[in-house]
């Protein structure tokens, strides 16, 4: 039984999604909804986000809707206090949603060195029992480093949303 699940995955631009009305988002959110319901029915009581646009933002929207039906908490743990400060207004509005959850913190005041990202990843993994990732090793991004750390942690449960699964949901 997982109680705290880290949620992360591709950013919108990594998927070639640049419009909020892109029909692929509906399919992705349908998959997230199914998976989140399964996690909740199996005892999840926290979903932890990193504050990234794309998959995390869509998952956050789903999680906020599900809070009307299920009793669970949502947290955003940013890498830096100034996360998103250089974003455009539309993206800052999305960032604001990440700050309107049950728990919000950051691990560092600001960027000082690349080692902070490794420390941040360790912190996230050590404070969650599992992860839900939209990631495929054939379409690598920086998430591969986080995934490698997860795979090294004993009894860390990793669930994936894959492109194949999205195709199955699309065909339903």
Swiss-Prot record:
InterPro entries the UniProt entry points to: YspA (IPR010697)
SUPFAM superfamilies: MCP/YpsA-like (SSF102405)
Domain of life of the native organism: Bacteria
Signal peptide region: none
Gene3D superfamilies xrefs: 3.40.50.450
Similarity remark: Belongs to the UPF0398 family.
Listed name of the protein: UPF0398 protein SAG0300
